[in-house]
């Protein structure tokens, strides 16, 4: 189980860096046929979609973990569960015996890092479109 969680964490950690460097797997059949201006528009569109996905993932993680509600209940897990019917903080892993939310924390981390990288890439793409780079 530890090996599985380690592999999942490494995948999410490297995915953010790969997307920042624009080295992800991509199908470039259409963009290769476009002129330079068209390619720039495709890059901006892709960067926009990545950023929108990342922001949606941040929002979903916020709703999943519900940190404000947890704080409002005084970090009392039972009170939190009773108020929200969200059992994220109570479920244990099968063999390690740790709370699963610790293993799942990679998802909000990835969402935040992807959002930051998405903003950076989009700004870079828009700047390149204006011919400043």
Map each language-model feature to its residues.
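Alpha-helical transmembrane segments and membrane-interface helix-loop junctions
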Residues: 1-133
